[in-house]
Amino acid sequence: TNIGAEIIKKNIVTKIIPNSNTDGSDGYTVTFKNSFSFLPTKKHHVKSRGIVFSGGVLGTVRLLLNMKEKHLLKLSNKTGEDIRTNNESLIYVVSKDSSKDFSKGVAIGSIFPSDENSHIEPVRYGAGSNFWKLMGVPLTFGSNIFVRIGKLLFDFVRHPISWLRIYFTKKFSERSIILLFMQHLDSTVKFKKGLFNLTSHISTGIAPSAFIPEAKELAENASKIINGKPFVLCTEALTGIPTTAHILGGAVIGKTAKTGVIDENHKVFGYENMYVCDGSAVSANPGVNPSLTITAMTEMAMSKFPHKGT
């Protein structure tokens, strides 16, 4: 049933400008273009009575920071601040036993608290989800990239048959368990608009790290249980930059524009009919997968909207 919503796929919003009233009370003009073309493409424009940002932290915060400079000047100075992760570590444990099949069942079915601040969730991917092995290398810790590269090469030389079996198996996802390690420990990052993209800076706490000793120990123990090898993304092992699926904040809730970007109903301070309803609004580190938190917060925000016709 068509209820009035139209999804315009493969496009990206590049500009949002209030109409005649600078607070957006009479609506906005939204500019968008094809996001899959490397050549200059025609820009399109639509007018709307209101705006709901729901592009995830990287999409929403990037657009807000771009607009804050020229078109949405009333946005809070807190835009791009209070960004958090779950202090996350993603480690694959790949069994050397070709008869193993961990791909059947729900994606995440249990959670294990390893200490008062940490827990781990075993994750499974469906059969055929093998792309990640092209980006993986042995789990390696080290103080700098040269030490880590040396350890990687040593591991390949020491266990060549094991790694050849892992890289050339057609059943990588079936033989893999992904250990999703997360912590409640709090630290914040600030995003700023750079020359070509967003740049990040530490605001409070310790910088997120790809090298968490507790996660390494758990992965090594799991490897012994399933006769496997721990396996991480090459970006983590080589650059030391952590990977997270749960980035939060950047347009957080506050009492005023001095403490947040949106109010308790997700309305953007300084503008009418403008809301943020995604992970950008989350103001703390829940330490677990935030999907249901984001869903609940969005449902609450939508419940405050007047029903059509009232």
State each model region's role.
Residues N2, K15-N21, T31-S110, D278, ...:
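Glycine-rich loop(s) and the adjacent beta-strand/alpha-helix scaffold that form part
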Residues K9, T14-I17, I177-L180, T199-A284, ...:
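A glycine-rich dinucleotide-binding beta-alpha-beta segment and adjacent secondary-structure elements
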Residues N11, L90, S162-Y167, T259-V261, ...:
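Short alpha-helical segments and helix-capping/turn motifs at coil-helix boundaries
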Residues S25-T29:
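A generic structural signal for beta-strand entry/edge sites
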Residues P40-T41, V61-L63, D101-F102, K190-F191, ...:
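Short helix/loop capping segments that flank catalytic or ligand/cofactor-binding pockets
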Residues S48-G50, S76-N197, I202-T204, I247, ...:
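FAD cofactor-binding and catalytic pocket of flavoenzymes
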Residues F53-S54, Y167, G205-S209, V288:
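Hydrophobic alpha-helical scaffolding
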